[in-house]
Structure formats: structure tokens, C-alpha cells
């Protein structure tokens, strides 16, 4: 399978890529900083590191061409500002989805978090407080971004790890 990974140099992205390569998949890591990506990800015959910005639709479309799956493992930096208010995914995810599906990608996996959307109902009281108070900005951004890309069903699968 050919997999395009966004958020490749983050902790989850690195783990995902190493597992995908271990299982024999071809991976394209779309990254802002190729030198950083090479240092973090190393080299592998099935790994392609493609430089680009999430707002550069032409470059993202070119990286998406021929891919079977796009895995968005994007996340916000854990800063006080992001915890209080974030629009990172709301601003980027609709454009990303339009671009990659327009380039022919048929399946998109979006990393979310346990406590976002319907999953908050199954969380313990302390976890719900964390979701609603401490992580409010980041989780609100994820919920709003999900709503903005809902039109792309059935292309989207969401992962809510952490339970």
C-alpha cells in the first residue's frame, strides 16, 4: 500500500512510519523540514521524504498522486496558547482533504484523540474535566475540524487513541 503521511516528524508520525515500513508499505512523508525528517526517520528504500507546506496545494497534490491512503497525524504544539485556543486543524484540514481527494486518494485516516466528539461520553469524570477544561482549545479545534470535513465521507476514518 502507498501511504502519504502528514505530521511525519511528530512522535506519533515517527512510530506510524516505522511500523508501516516494517510491514512493507511504501511511505511518503510530506514535511516542512526534510533535513529534520531524515534525521528523525532515517533512510529506507520504501520511504520518500517530500518537502512541502500544508498550504501549498500544488505540492501537496503532487505528493498525493498515486497514494492509496493519506494519514493525517497532525497535532498542535502543547503550549498554553494552544490549550486555550487553537484553529490549527480548522484552518488546514478542509484544504488538505480537498487537495488529497482531488488528487485521487480514496481513504484518509485522521488522528483525533480520546475525549473528542462522542468519545467523551465514555470517559471517566477526571478525563472529561481534562477534555473540557485543560484541553479545551485543542479538542474544540478537533471537533470543529471534523465537522468541516464531514462532507468527505466515506473517504474518512477517524482514530481516537488513548482509551
Summary of predicted features, one role per range:
Residues 26, 46-48, 155-157:
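Conserved beta-strand segments of alpha/beta enzyme cores
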Residues 77, 114-116, 163:
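Active-site segment of SDR-like NAD(P)-dependent oxidoreductases
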Amino acid at each position: 500500500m502507498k501511504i502519504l503521511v502528514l505530521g511525519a516528524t511528530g512522535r506519533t508520525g515517527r512510530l506510524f512510519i516505522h511500523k508501516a515500513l516494517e510491514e512493507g508499505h511504501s511511505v511518503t512523508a510530506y514535511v516542512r523540514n526534510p533535513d529534520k525528517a531524515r534525521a528523525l526517520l532515517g533512510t529506507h528504500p520504501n520511504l520518500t521524504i517530500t518537502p512541502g507546506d500544508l498550504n501549498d496545494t500544488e505540492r501537496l497534490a503532487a505528493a498525493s498522486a498515486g497514494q492509496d491512503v493519506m494519514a493525517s497525524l497532525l497535532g498542535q504544539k502543547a503550549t498554553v496558547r494552544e490549550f486555550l485556543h487553537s484553529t490549527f486543524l480548522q484552518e488546514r484540514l478542509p484544504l488538505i482533504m480537498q487537495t488529497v481527494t482531488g488528487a485521487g486518494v480514496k481513504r484518509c485516516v485522521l488522528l483525533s484523540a480520546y475525549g473528542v466528539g462522542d468519545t467523551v461520553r465514555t470517559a471517566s469524570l477526571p478525563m472529561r474535566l481534562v477534555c473540557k477544561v485543560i484541553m479545551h482549545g485543542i479538542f474544540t479545534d478537533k471537533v470543529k475540524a471534523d465537522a468541516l470535513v464531514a462532507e468527505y465521507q466515506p473517504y474518512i476514518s477517524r482514530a481516537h487513541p488513548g482509551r
